């Protein structure tokens, strides 16, 4: 009896210690997963810049210090590209303003009706000039999206007029007037908007801005024809993928949950297309019932592009559609200053695609490629610990770069004029 009692009393005190060890192990495991998922150990750093050693680029970096300073995302979650992207996708922006604009309607030759919203500046531009931002949003987006409203409001307050394209078919309350909607690289509507701005405001200089898919469209537009670059001071592209053909393979991979994002975007595209089902699949349309059936079962953007989107412009195959609608074949024709912005942790743009802007910046002196460690896809939120600020790093860097270009245009040395034949060394001597 005494032996049993002694055994009981020697074992019992060890049980809580064992359970405490299990709890500690569980807590440690959870913390490890949190640290890994939130990428908390990742450092903050300035953007990795690729550019050539020119007088203009040195002026831009000096006048736009945000490009050389650390981008610091919110401490607890801002280093996760997935959370940055999710917050952008769900909320767009925090405490988004409501800028007031006028909607314009432009009839197209094929019967379609392009629409864009025009926002006048809320202050004088510091250069004293009339400057207009011509803005192309991301896939299926329009002027009413929160991230667009935030950017427009910030630009207006800095003295910029803003014209925002509404992608054909994207606005929920605007019916299509022809059996065609926006595609990955069709520049017709953007060209119509730019033409309207140039005609209505003949003294205005243009800043071209594109977000994600919009970045592809604006770069393709500028590279398609040299006349498209007239009166354009510069162009900024944020979070685009440059080549749909090369991106196609990566979008089918589960790495960085890219296949899941592909499914979500495909589902959103289906909703947009089906909201215009009567026009797109009705009388006079090239679409047939079998294509509508395949749309219902599509689980990827590639399936939708192959069954629906490529046929709006008569492309014979998905490969042909992606090749002809990607800016990678046109971007080298852009001669105005060009800022390309991407993020390492963007779950939608595979790192292999970033060789395109990096190589371009190494070869062309008008191009600056800025690659941030964090920011996700069109996130770039800033904040101390938990709550993000309404204005993002992305909003600031675009406006600061545009303002620096306006300053350069006003005070650039004679050797930097388009007709000048002076070499770079002479120019550097004149500006030193």
UniProtKB/Swiss-Prot annotation:
The way this protein sits in the membrane is described as: Single-pass type II membrane protein
Enzyme Commission designation: 3.1.1.23, 3.1.1.6, 3.1.1.79
Record comment: activity regulation:
Acylglycerol lipase activity is activated upon binding to progesterone.
Q: Which residues lie on this side of the membrane: Cytoplasmic?
A: 1-14
Domain AB hydrolase-1 residues, every copy: 132-383
The record's catalysed reaction(s) read: Hydrolyzes glycerol monoesters of long-chain fatty acids; an acetyl ester + H2O = an aliphatic alcohol + acetate + H(+); a triacylglycerol + H2O = a diacylglycerol + a fatty acid + H(+); 2-(5Z,8Z,11Z,14Z-eicosatetraenoyl)-glycerol + H2O = glycerol + (5Z,8Z,11Z,14Z)-eicosatetraenoate + H(+)
Q: Which residue intervals are topologically Extracellular?
A: 36-432
Q: Where in the cell is it found?
A: Cell membrane
- What segment(s) does the record annotate as region Disordered? 413-432
TM regions (residue ranges):
15-35
Q: Which family does it belong to?
A: Belongs to the AB hydrolase superfamily. AB hydrolase 4 family.
PANTHER family cross-referenced by the UniProt entry: ABHYDROLASE DOMAIN-CONTAINING PROTEIN, MONOACYLGLYCEROL LIPASE ABHD2
> What job does this protein perform?
Progesterone-dependent acylglycerol lipase that catalyzes hydrolysis of endocannabinoid arachidonoylglycerol (AG) from cell membrane. Acts as a progesterone receptor: progesterone-binding activates the acylglycerol lipase activity, mediating degradation of 1-arachidonoylglycerol (1AG) and 2-arachidonoylglycerol (2AG) to glycerol and arachidonic acid (AA). Also displays an ester hydrolase activity against acetyl ester, butanoate ester and hexadecanoate ester.
The name on file for this protein is: Monoacylglycerol lipase ABHD2
Species this chain originates from: Danio rerio (Zebrafish)
């Amino acid at each position: 009896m005494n032996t049993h009692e002694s055994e009981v009393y020697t074992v019992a005190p060890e049980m809580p210690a064992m359970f405490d060890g299990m709890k500690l192990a569980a807590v440690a495991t959870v913390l490890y997963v949190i640290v890994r998922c939130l990428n908390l150990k990742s450092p903050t750093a300035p953007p990795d810049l690729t550019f050539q050693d020119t007088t203009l680029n040195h002026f831009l970096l000096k006048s736009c210090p945000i490009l050389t300073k650390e981008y610091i995302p919110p401490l607890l979650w801002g280093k996760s590209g997935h959370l940055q992207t999710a917050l952008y996708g769900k909320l767009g922006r925090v405490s988004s303003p409501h800028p007031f604009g006028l909607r314009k309607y432009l009839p197209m030759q094929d019967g379609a009706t392009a629409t864009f919203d025009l926002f006048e500046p809320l202050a004088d531009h510091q250069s004293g000039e009339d400057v207009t931002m011509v803005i192309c949003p991301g896939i299926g987006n329009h002027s009413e999206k929160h991230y667009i409203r935030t950017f427009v409001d910030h630009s207006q307050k800095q003295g910029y007029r803003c014209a925002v394209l509404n992608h054909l078919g994207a606005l929920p309350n605007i019916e299509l007037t022809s059996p065609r909607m926006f595609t990955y690289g069709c520049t017709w509507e953007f060209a119509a908007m730019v033409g309207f701005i140039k005609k209505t405001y003949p003294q205005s200089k243009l800043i071209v801005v594109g977000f994600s898919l919009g970045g592809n469209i604006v770069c393709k537009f500028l590279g398609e024809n040299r006349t498209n670059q007239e009166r354009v001071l510069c162009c900024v592209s944020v979070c685009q993928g440059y080549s749909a053909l090369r991106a196609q393979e990566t979008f089918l991979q589960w790495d960085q949950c890219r296949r899941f994002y592909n499914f979500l975007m495909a589902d959103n595209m289906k909703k947009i297309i089906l909201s215009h089902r009567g026009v797109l699949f009705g009388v006079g349309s090239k679409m047939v019932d079998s294509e509508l059936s395949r749309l219902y079962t599509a689980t990827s953007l590639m399936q939708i592009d192959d069954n629906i989107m490529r046929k709006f412009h008569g492309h014979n195959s998905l490969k042909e559609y992606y090749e002809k609608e990607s800016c990678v074949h046109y971007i080298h024709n852009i001669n105005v200053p060009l800022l390309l912005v991407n993020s390492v942790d963007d779950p939608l743009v595979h790192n292999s695609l970033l060789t395109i802007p990096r190589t371009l910046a190494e070869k062309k002196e008008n191009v600056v490629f800025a690659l941030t460690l964090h920011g996700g896809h069109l996130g770039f939120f800033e904040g101390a610990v938990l709550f993000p600020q309404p204005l993002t790093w992305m909003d600031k860097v675009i406006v600061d770069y545009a303002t620096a270009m306006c300053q350069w245009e006003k005070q650039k040395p004679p050797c930097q004029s388009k007709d000048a034949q002076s070499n770079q060394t002479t120019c550097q001597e004149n500006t030193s």
